[in-house]
Amino acid sequence: MNLLSRFSHRALFSTLCLSAASWIGINTAHAQISTLRTGKLPNGLTYYISKDAGGSQGTAHFYLLQNVGALLENDQQQGLAHFLEHMAFNSTKHYPQGVMTWLRQRGLYDFDARTGQDETRFSISEVPTAAPGLTDSVMMVLRDWCDGVNITDKDTEKERGIVIEEWRQRNSVSKRLSDSIASVVYNNSQYAARNVIGPLRSLETLTAKDVQRFYRTWYRPDLQCVVIVGDIDPEVYEAKVKAMFGSIKKPKKAEVRANFTIADNTTPLYYRFVDAENQSHSYGLYQRVATPTSLQGQAATKEFLFQQLFNDIAPKYFAYLRNDNR
């Protein structure tokens, strides 16, 4: 755990003010919930579409959320979920030259993707809405990500070098620490066995067919969600989503998407980490908190914000006490 060396009451006050401002913003968003369009297509794909009355004048933001992450990998597939995320920016059905190339050629640089243990998220933001053809094309990128990624041997070899270099850059003391303590933090669950990027041996040996198999198994409409927010007419974009994404086929025999949990330990767990490159002494205290499943809407939002606020303030305050209130 990294602790700040200094902490002041003013810093605490500023943090509280910022968090309160975020809270007010969320409540304001709930007051405008009438603009939200949500639904589920017959193939199982979920969508959320809303007009942003605030800071998105003239632009829109597009997201594709996959209920697919590293936890769904078997022992021979470790690292595939993250590798597939990289592959999605290469050749696709409607963008054979590569999605990343197409986006940059049109001045769209605010795009990103992230793979976690539970999910994978893609985003293309700050898309001008004055040209409907551009937003339609961006929606087609999301559509291709759903089931139209071209996973070729050539692209696989190119991304292999990129991902292996990413693995090497991450192979730091902090990464080795997080991997080492995972067994106690996650109580030897599947979360402890999947660190997203995967082991080097897997990255060196995976094939295009391996990636294709994972893609065809898990990237499917019942595990996908499209989110569009911005200076848009939600009714118009809802019709576009239905027309564009409704044709995605749901597999007749789909693999069951398992839900993974972390069992409570009966006594506190402890791990001592020693590394030759570690230049500092530190300690960490972890408390697992169950995600509330019964909360919905505003109550769920407030609970989420409270946890984020606590996680932000607590380490700073402990650092403040450690440094004799300086």
Name what the model sees in each region:
Residues 90-92, 111, 138-141, 145, ...:
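Scaffold signal of the M16-like zinc-metallopeptidase fold and its non-catalytic homologs
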Residues 29-31:
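Boundary at the C-terminal end of the N-terminal hydrophobic targeting segment
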Residues 225-283:
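An aromatic/glycine/proline-enriched structural segment found at the starts
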Residues 1-9:
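N-terminal secretory signal peptides that target proteins for export/translocation
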